[in-house]
Regions:
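Active-site beta->alpha loop and helix N-cap motifs at the rims of alpha/beta catalytic domains
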Residues: 2-178, 314-324, 328, 337-363
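Catalytic alpha/beta core domains of metabolic enzymes, predominantly
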Residues: 160-169, 173-291
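A structural signal for short hydrophobic/aromatic patches embedded in well-ordered alpha helices
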Residues: 49, 80, 189, 267-270, ...
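Generic N-terminal leader/processing signal
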Residues: 1-2, 13, 198, 297
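A residue-level signal for beta-strand positions that form part of recognition/binding surfaces
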Residues: 24-26, 196, 295
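Structured C-terminal cap/extension of enzyme domains
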Residues: 230-364
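Short, conserved catalytic or adaptor-binding loops enriched in Gly and charged residues
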Residues: 19-22, 130-132, 189, 233-234, ...
Length: 364
C-alpha cells in the first residue's frame, strides 16, 4: 500500500496525505450486494464476505455497478452505505461511496443524501462532512449518460459535482454511460480541481493512461491481463478496482506481491490463469436473463468461496430481481474453477444442512 504522493501536485498531495496517511490501497473492491429471500439486504452474509476478502483488499466501493448500484432504491442504498461505514470502520479499510445516476441532477441528489447520512453517523463538520478517510474517502461518479453527448456536456456535468469541493473519484464506464471521458477532459479537470484525486477506467481501451496522464491515482477496472497493466511491469496503473476482487481477492493480491518480489514469471502465469477463468465465467454470465453480468459472475465465484466444492448443493444467491442465480451458472463456474485450479478446498461459511438458506448460515 506504499505509494508516493509527490507526482500529484501540492494541493492534491495534501488531500491524499490526509485521507491515506498509511498509503494508498492498491486493490479495491466494488462489493456485491447479498439479499435475503424477501429482497432485503443480507447484512450477515455481506459481513462474512467482507471479512473473507478484507485481508487482501484495502478499499471498497459501495454501491457500485457490481453491487447493483444503478438499480437500488434510495432506501437500499442508504442501508448499504450505513452498513459499509460501520463494517469498514471496524476492519480499518477505506470506503468510496458510489453516487450513480444517468443525469447530473440525480448524482447531486445522491451525494446530498449520502452527505446527510455521513454527518449523522460520524459527526463530520460542514466542510468535509466527515470525509476524512475514517473510513469514507470520497465519492465515485460517472459522467452523464448519453452516446451523443459532447465532451463539453460531459465536462459540464462532472464540473458540477467537482464544484462541491468533496474528495472525488471519476469513473470511466462506457458500458453503462454510452460514452467516454476523453483524456483531454480528464487532464483539464485535474488541473482545475485538486479534489479530483482518483480515476478508475473500466473501458478496456486505456486511452487516458496511454496519453500520459498521471496526476491522479489510476485504478484499472477492466478485467484481464492483470500483471501487464501495473506500473513497474510495463503498465500505467497504480492498482485495481475490480469486480473480481469479490471472488479472487487473494489471487489478485498475489499477482502484485509476486511482481514486487521480482517473481515476474510466476506473476504473469497466475495472471494468465486468472484472466482465462474470469473471461470464461463472465462470458457465461452475459447469457443469463436476470441481473447484470458483473454481479452474477462474482456471486457465483463467491458462492464457491463460501461453501467450497459442494456449493451447488446450497441454495444459490438471491439476485436483485428477486430470483436466484440459475444453477447452471453455478455448475459452469464450478467446472471452470476446478479446471483452472482455483476451487477452494473449503468454504468460509458453514451450513447446517443441505440447501441451507442464508437464515441458517453461520461464520465458519
Amino acid at each position: 500500500m506504499d505509494q508516493k504522493f509527490s507526482r500529484f501536485g501540492q494541493q492534491r498531495e495534501h488531500l491524499l496525505e490526509r485521507i491515506f496517511p498509511e498509503g494508498i490501497p492498491t486493490l479495491w473492491c466494488p462489493l456485491i450486494t447479498h439479499y435475503t429471500d424477501d429482497g432485503g439486504i443480507d447484512r450477515k452474509r455481506m459481513r462474512a464476505h467482507l471479512e473473507h476478502i478484507s485481508p487482501y483488499v484495502g478499499g471498497f466501493l459501495l454501491p457500485g455497478s457490481t453491487g447493483d448500484g444503478w438499480e437500488l432504491s434510495e432506501a437500499q442504498s442508504r442501508q448499504l452505505i450505513e452498513y459499509a461505514i460501520a463494517e469498514t470502520t471496524v476492519l480499518g479499510r477505506k470506503l468510496l461511496i458510489g453516487a450513480l445516476g444517468q443525469k447530473t441532477d440525480t448524482v447531486m441528489d445522491s451525494i446530498a443524501s449520502s452527505l446527510a447520512l455521513i454527518r449523522q453517523l460520524n459527526g463530520g463538520d460542514g466542510t468535509t462532512a466527515g470525509i476524512d478517510g475514517r473510513p469514507v474517502c470520497g465519492f465515485t461518479v460517472c459522467g452523464p449518460s448519453g452516446k451523443d453527448l459532447t465532451q463539453a456536456q460531459i465536462r459540464s456535468g462532472l464540473q458540477a459535482v467537482l464544484d462541491l469541493g468533496l474528495p472525488t473519484s471519476l469513473y470511466q464506464l462506457p458500458q453503462v454511460t454510452g460514452n467516454e471521458i476523453s483524456a483531454q477532459t480528464i487532464r483539464e479537470l485535474a488541473a482545475l480541481y485538486p479534489n479530483f484525486y482518483l480515476f478508475k477506467d473500466t473501458s478496456g481501451t486505456d486511452r487516458v493512461t496511454a496519453s500520459g496522464f498521471r496526476n491522479a491515482i489510476l485504478l484499472r477496472g477492466a478485467e484481464g491481463n492483470y500483471a501487464q497493466h501495473l506500473a513497474g511491469n510495463g503498465g500505467h496503473y497504480d492498482g485495481f478496482l475490480l469486480s473480481t476482487a469479490n471472488g479472487f481477492a487473494r489471487e489478485l493480491h498475489e499477482v502484485r506481491s509476486l511482481l514486487e518480489q521480482g517473481s515476474t514469471t510466476q506473476a504473469e502465469a497466475l495472471s494468465t490463469r486468472l484472466s482465462t477463468a474470469v473471461n470464461e465465467i463472465f462470458s457465461f454470465a452475459q447469457t443469463l436473463p436476470d441481473g447484470n453480468a458483473f454481479a452474477n459472475a462474482n456471486k457465483a465465484v463467491d458462492h464457491f468461496n463460501a461453501f467450497g466444492p459442494a456449493a451447488v448443493a446450497v441454495d444459490a444467491p438471491m439476485l436483485r430481481c428477486g430470483r436466484r442465480l440459475p444453477v447452471r451458472m453455478l455448475d459452469f463456474t464450478g467446472e471452470v474453477l476446478k479446471r483452472h485450479q482455483l476451487m477452494p478446498q473449503s468454504g468460509y461459511l458453514q451450513s447446517v444442512g443441505r440447501n441451507a438458506g442464508t437464515e441458517q448460515l453461520k461464520a465458519a
